[in-house]
């Protein structure tokens, strides 16, 4: 059980890892990461809990036994017999521990620097009290000449020192010695008493420039040599050729004591240092020197906690290799959504190396800022960044670098301006609502289109729109400030039916960006074969270079030559190497009544994938947010377009028979037809015996935007039905009569957390579950196979279906707690008439150990209870559990039992779990309980005593 695992050492320098062979002790959890790869949460042998890591299966060499053990335990977890390991909580504790270690290290360093500062100040005070030493004249002629020169130098230095005293700056000067306070015997005392050292010059400055460049380990690099004639200038430093080894040493950031000597020098002109210290107390807390050069020309500053409260950071990379995938993978340890917004380069021939990164919370942004990056510059940015390119135009003069003629320093400033004045065409384009308007009578001009960038594609790809040299210069227009203008996608005109049409002349180069749609990036996939459900296969290697398929490319820019396969959310496209396998093996629908503009809009909103069937090609469409597909097809590069389109050989001829069976009808809606029937005809949605209905209000509830929810909403809007979609539903919308609520399958495990799923709402509303189902074990299964393992079944037996299932249809479930049985031993006999009348719609469900629970209670807590009552209760329980005629009496399964210290609480939690699994069978879930022993209310459960049950349920059907 060994595996290669690089374990980071928190106490070592950042970036260092120790790659070695480690033993896998246990697997605690598993997950599918953003790239669609299955990972396991590993407990390593000989390491503590804070060394647990997520590892892909390929890293677990020789751990087959542990994997088998984990698969067995996972089955028990799925059945509720074992509690799952909380990996997220463990990761949070790890992060908290790392922060605490870093805090202690910072505190220790701060304490050491404080002591150092105090010693320096005390030493300097003693030195200031010493009188200046006089120069003794020696008879020797050569020594007289040397002494005379030294006297002149001393006079010059005294004059400068007096000038500094007049500016009230000398009280802030200090010096450093070899042992932090002890004078080296090799150092001339004259220089120590009469001349300010390099450190003195630094301490005279008030603060370091906030524009300094961030470095690795959260430090900031600032160049000290900045000649200036400002008033606060102080004597500077000569270059290393004039160094005099005085034996003075300064503490280094990476070692206890540096071997780099510091000395004092003269310079022909004063030098100005960037402000570095905000107060006197910050002197020792912010300064230490780098050992990278003999001179202290690179000054490192300890990174203090940022005071700026923001969700956004700005990242730049001088190497120019910054990509979205690099950013997302580097900050993958941060939970939640991460939005990346790249800035356009001011120069059209260069790729911009700057990007805004926006997090869900301020704490996440600070965490990313604190971590930094070895080669990136990370800066906090005030405010949130809008990703809407039409409504927020950002000036491209983001990074201005001004070289100084007097020094080798650069001052870097970040500026962001928003263009308030838009052209009329831009204002019009930004107001177009793609959700509502399906006919676009818009005159598209050069200013309205979007610019295409070069796409960087992997070696197995050829790109259609990567030849910028073939675009005429007249088509490439840019403003002076870097704002991009549109390269038109061919000559765009309006047909007689007011639809957009791209006209292409025979002489135009079809591989150029100017002849293709500006909304997509097209790539050709070659050299691979796909297999569909074990039956359909073809060889894509026959597809040649795009220049030999001009007709194919012409058809790509037309909006009228495609049929669209139904939308599929990315969560069901785990590995799109088998993407078409999973799409085509289900009862999904080919659509021929949707235009491409509407399709692209829904695809963008839903973050899913879709397939376009043409006579000469097949297209796979997805957005950049679909990480699994982006990684699988090696899609790279930045562009204004949010879409990728992968071109395959035509599938239409292969799927003729399959398409004919699933072709979506173009039947218009008529008021004489029920809405639900119309919906079923459009989508081939399975429904269990529900009659026609006439809804006055449609509520669509989805955890996140999905193509299923988008399409369902559009269907009802086309039928002119009031429709609302979201998670938080206003209470006023439930006041209408005949309200229908559609819940997406993504919420199936969270029904008990939806506040509107109350008993009162179930009386006045009708609920339905919709969406693309998970794989079923067989087409006849009526429930989603939650314990289905994809490795246990061949692909040709998987069934994916789009369905609409009623929720909480009728009937109910009743259960009784132990306290209720103790109070009323005849409880089961009293409610038996109700169960007999409702035997077709209601059931009584009991724990499998109810008899033992009753015996144990009376023996332990109430031994004086009448033996006759106890025996009668036990006989009743035994009869209910063993009589085959009582078909509506059943027991919980062992794996459905939720264990708790209290038997009543355990039963309430078990009934809540049972409700989540049987929402499509029963409307009411009733727990008869002794109300003196209060239970926490559970959404969707009726917790009543016997009297209330009799009043509410039994009398409603004529029982007294």
From Swiss-Prot:
Q: Where is the Chromo domain?
A: 22-74
Where does it live in the cell?
Answer: Nucleus; Cytoplasm, Cytoskeleton, Microtubule organizing center, Spindle pole body
| GO-annotated cellular components | condensed chromosome, centromeric region; cytoplasm; heterochromatin island; mating-type region heterochromatin; nucleus; pericentric heterochromatin; RITS complex; spindle pole body
InterPro entries according to UniProt? CD_Chp1-like, Chp1_domII, Chp1_PIN, Chromo-like_dom_sf, Chromo/chromo_shadow_dom, Chromo_domain, Chromodomain_CS, Heterochromatin_chromo-domain
Q: Entry's CDD domains?
A: CD_Chp1_like, RRM_SF, SPOC_Chp1p
Q: Which PROSITE patterns match?
A: CHROMO_1, CHROMO_2
Q: What is its main location?
A: nucleus
Its biological purpose is as follows: Component of the kinetochore which plays a role in stabilizing microtubules and so allowing accurate chromosome segregation. Has a role in the RNA interference (RNAi) pathway which is important for heterochromatin formation and accurate chromosome segregation. A member of the RNA-induced transcriptional silencing (RITS) complex which is involved in the biosynthesis of dsRNA from primer siRNAs provided by the RNA-directed RNA polymerase (RDRC) complex.
The molecule here is called Chromo domain-containing protein 1
């Amino acid at each position: 059980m060994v595996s290669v695992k690089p374990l980071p050492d928190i106490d070592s320098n950042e970036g260092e890892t120790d790659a070695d062979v480690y033993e896998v002790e246990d697997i605690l959890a598993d997950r599918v990461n953003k790239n669609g790869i299955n990972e396991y949460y590993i407990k390593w042998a000989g390491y503590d809990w804070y060394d647990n890591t997520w590892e892909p299966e390929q890293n677990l060499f020789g751990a087959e036994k542990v994997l088998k053990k984990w698969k067995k335990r996972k089955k028990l977890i799925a059945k509720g017999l074992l509690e799952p390991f909380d990996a997220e909580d463990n990761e949070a504790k790890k992060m908290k521990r790392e922060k605490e270690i870093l805090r202690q290290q910072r505190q220790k360093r701060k304490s050491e620097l404080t002591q150092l500062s105090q010693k320096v100040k005390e030493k300097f005070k003693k030195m200031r009290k010493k009188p200046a030493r006089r120069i003794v004249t020696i008879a020797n002629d050569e020594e007289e000449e040397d002494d005379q020169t030294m006297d002149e130098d001393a006079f010059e230095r005294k004059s400068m020192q007096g000038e500094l005293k007049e500016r009230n700056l000398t009280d802030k000067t200090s010096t450093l010695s070899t042992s932090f306070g002890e004078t080296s015997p090799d150092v001339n005392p004259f220089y120590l008493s009469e001349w300010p050292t390099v450190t003195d010059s630094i301490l005279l400055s008030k603060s370091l420039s906030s524009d300094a460049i961030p470095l690795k380990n959260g430090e900031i690099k600032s160049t000290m040599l900045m000649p200036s004639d400002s008033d606060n200038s102080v004597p500077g430093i000569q270059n290393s050729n004039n160094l005099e080894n005085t034996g003075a040493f300064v503490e280094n950031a990476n070692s206890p004591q540096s071997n780099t000597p510091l000395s004092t020098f003269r310079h022909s002109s004063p030098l100005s240092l960037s402000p570095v210290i905000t107060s006197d107390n910050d002197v020792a807390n912010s300064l230490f020197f780098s050992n990278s050069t003999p001179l202290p020309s690179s000054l490192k500053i300890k990174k203090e906690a940022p005071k700026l409260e923001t969700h956004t950071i700005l990242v730049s990379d001088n190497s120019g290799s910054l990509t979205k995938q690099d950013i997302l993978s580097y900050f993958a340890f941060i939970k939640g959504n991460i939005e990346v917004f790249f800035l356009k380069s001011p120069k059209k021939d260069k790729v911009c190396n700057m990007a805004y990164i926006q997090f869900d919370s301020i704490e996440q942004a600070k965490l990313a800022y604190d971590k930094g990056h070895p080669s990136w510059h990370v800066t906090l940015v005030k405010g949130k960044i809008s990703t809407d390119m039409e409504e927020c135009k950002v000036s491209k003069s983001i990074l201005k670098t001004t070289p100084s003629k007097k020094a080798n320093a650069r001052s870097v400033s970040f500026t962001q301006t928003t263009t308030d004045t838009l052209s009329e065409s831009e204002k019009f384009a930004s107001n177009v609502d793609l959700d509502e308007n399906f006919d676009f009578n818009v005159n598209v001009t050069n200013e309205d289109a979007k610019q295409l960038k070069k796409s960087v594609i992997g070696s197995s790809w050829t790109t259609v729109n990567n030849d910028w040299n073939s675009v005429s210069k007249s088509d490439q227009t840019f403003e002076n400030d870097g704002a991009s203008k549109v390269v038109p996608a061919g000559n765009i005109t309006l047909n007689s039916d007011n639809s957009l049409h791209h006209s292409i002349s025979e002489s135009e180069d079809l591989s150029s960006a100017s002849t293709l749609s500006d909304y997509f990036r097209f790539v050709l996939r070659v050299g691979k074969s796909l297999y569909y459900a074990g039956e359909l296969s073809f060889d894509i290697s026959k597809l040649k270079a795009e220049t030999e398929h001009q007709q194919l490319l012409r058809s790509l820019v037309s909006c009228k030559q495609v049929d669209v396969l139904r939308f599929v959310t990315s969560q069901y496209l785990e590995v799109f190497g088998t993407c078409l396998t999973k799409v085509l093996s289900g009862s999904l629908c080919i659509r021929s009544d949707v235009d491409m503009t509407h399709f692209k809009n829904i695809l963008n909103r839903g973050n899913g994938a879709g397939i376009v069937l043409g006579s000469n090609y097949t297209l796979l469409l997805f957005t950049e947010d679909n990480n699994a597909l982006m990684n699988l097809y090696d899609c790279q590069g930045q562009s204004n377009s949010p879409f990728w389109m992968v071109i395959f050989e035509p599938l239409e001829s292969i799927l003729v028979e399959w398409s004919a069976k699933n072709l979506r009808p173009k039947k218009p809606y008529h008021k004489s037809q029920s809405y639900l029937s119309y919906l079923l005809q459009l989508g081939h949605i399975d429904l269990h015996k529900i009659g026609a209905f006439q809804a006055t209000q449609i509520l669509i509830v989805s955890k996140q935007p999905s193509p299923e929810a988008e399409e369902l909403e559009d269907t009802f809007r086309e039928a002119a039905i009031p429709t609302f979609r979201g998670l938080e539903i206003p209470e006023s919308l439930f006041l209408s009569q005949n309200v229908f609520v559609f819940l997406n399958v993504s919420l199936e495990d969270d029904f008990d957390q939806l506040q509107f799923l109350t008993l009162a709402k179930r009386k006045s509303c009708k609920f339905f579950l919709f969406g693309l189902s998970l794989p079923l074990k067989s087409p006849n299964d009526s429930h989603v196979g939650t314990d289905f393992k994809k490795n246990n079944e061949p692909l040709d037996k998987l069934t994916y279906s789009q369905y609409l299932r009623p929720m909480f249809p009728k009937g109910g479930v009743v259960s009784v707690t132990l306290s209720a049985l103790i109070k009323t031993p005849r409880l089961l006999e009293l409610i038996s008439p109700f169960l007999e009348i409702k035997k077709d719609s209601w059931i009584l469900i009991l724990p499998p150990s109810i008899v033992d629970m009753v015996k144990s209670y009376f023996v332990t807590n109430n031994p004086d209870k009448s033996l006759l009552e106890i025996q009668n209760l036990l006989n009743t329980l035994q009869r209910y559990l063993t009589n085959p005629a009582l078909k509506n009496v059943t027991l919980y399964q062992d794996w459905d039992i939720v264990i708790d210290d209290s038997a009543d609480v355990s039963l309430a939690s078990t009934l809540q779990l049972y409700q989540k699994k049987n929402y499509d069978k029963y409307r009411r879930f009733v727990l008869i309980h002794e109300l003196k022993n209060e239970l926490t209310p559970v959404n969707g459960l009726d917790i009543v005593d016997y009297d209330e049950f009799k009043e509410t349920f039994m009398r409603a059907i004529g029982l007294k």
